[in-house]
């Protein structure tokens, strides 16, 4: 059975990015673990709730076949410069990130010399990713080897479809 850990913010992660990807992983028979900064209940942007089974300090990315970083503004405020978040990205065998999450992940260096996308607000996220060595492109979804990135909830369906292809390899 394939294993995945989904990293979300404790307060205000993007519902559709999470639920579409979670459901696709379930259909692919993946064993899914939810993790957040703190091991407690996580609240979606639109109010739904899930429980994080692990705190980020307890997660090791190399123990899972894939690591998925879910975005939204609170992921930025909670995880920017977070050592555990960045460590997990570095340990990931296969890395998926959507919305603002690719920008936050880029600080780990895993996108160095790789082509990625993300949500972008007037060039800020693009500049941040490029500062840490990534090559940003304005596309809904980009797959670069074992990395899949997407620019936001509108690309969630394309994102999970590409992710499931990678999962099955």
Stretch-by-stretch model annotation:
Residues 99:
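Catalytic nucleophile serine of serine hydrolases
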Residues 1-94, 103-115, 123-169:
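Extended, subdomain-level signal for the structured scaffold at the beginning of enzyme domains
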């Amino acid at each position: 059975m394939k294993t995945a850990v989904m990293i979300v913010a404790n307060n205000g992660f993007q519902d559709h990015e999470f639920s579409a990807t979670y459901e696709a992983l379930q259909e692919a028979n993946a064993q899914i673990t939810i993790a957040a900064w703190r091991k407690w209940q996580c609240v979606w942007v639109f109010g739904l709730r899930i429980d994080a089974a692990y705190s980020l300090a307890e997660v090791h990315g190399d123990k899972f076949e894939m690591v998925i970083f879910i975005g939204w503004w609170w992921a930025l405020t909670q995880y920017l410069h977070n050592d555990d978040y960045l460590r997990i990205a570095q340990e990931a065998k296969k890395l998926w990130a959507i919305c603002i999450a690719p920008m936050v992940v880029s600080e780990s260096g895993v996108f160095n010399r790789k082509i990625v996308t993300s949500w972008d607000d007037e060039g800020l996220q693009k500049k941040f990713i490029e500062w840490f060595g990534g090559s940003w492109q304005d596309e809904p979804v980009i797959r670069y080897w074992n990395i899949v990135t997407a620019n936001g909830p509108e690309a969630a369906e394309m994102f999970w479809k590409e992710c499931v292809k990678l999962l099955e390899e």
